Amino acid sequence: IADKAGAYPSELSGGQKQRAAIARALASDPEILLCDEATSALDPQTTEAILKLLKKLNAQLGLTIVLITHQMNVVKEICTRTAVMENGRVVEQGDVFEIFANPQEKVTRSFVDTTSSLSGINTLIEEKSPLVQLKPGQKILRFKYLERSACEALVSTISRRFNIDLNIIFGSIEIIGDNPIGGLVVIADGKEDDIRDAVKYLCDINVGVEVILSA
């Protein structure tokens, strides 16, 4: 933005204003950089550029960055630790991976759901989509990988071991803090006892299981 040195603020784009604000803050050689809604109202490309800049500053300058945001995708992209606040108090805090893998508080779960395609199952159920019209004995299950490994072939393992048919509705795997985290929403079709044993097995290997709907 050196070519904008003589420009008025009104002549700058949102991204240029943010870069200027960051440069101004760095002029005093701080140990901590406070960024309050640093990506608010920016387009996706500019948001990505600002986050890359902040990550570069953190790595090259050893700068601690405190980021205030309502955008959980931003938290997922750049942060190593996070604190969730509600009504002016911290209700949950910890490692970003653990917060996304196993949120404890209702407000945290609602924030995390905004970043996951798996939450689309709730819309399908509300709209009574044909995709979620269950036959007798079927269940809709949501799996969530809680370990720092999301590589096990769960669907084939469960199907073979417990003689259950699993139809995948939603699935996702993403990287948070250099660790994979994944989830599936499936329709399980089989004997009640077999499904119950499968759920117990998944819990035993630290895969979170939620029964969303039963027929």
Where are these regions (language model features)?
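Conserved ABC ATPase signature
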Residues: 8-12, 16
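A short, proline-enriched helix->beta-strand linker immediately N-terminal to the Walker B motif
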Residues: 27-31
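Catalytic Walker B motif of ABC-type/P-loop ATPase nucleotide-binding domains
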Residues: 33-36
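Helix N-cap at the start of a conserved alpha-helix in ABC-type nucleotide-binding domains
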Residues: 44-46
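A short, surface-exposed alpha-helical micro-motif characterized by mixed small hydrophobic
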Residues: 75-77
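ABC ATPase "signature
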Residues: 93-94, 102
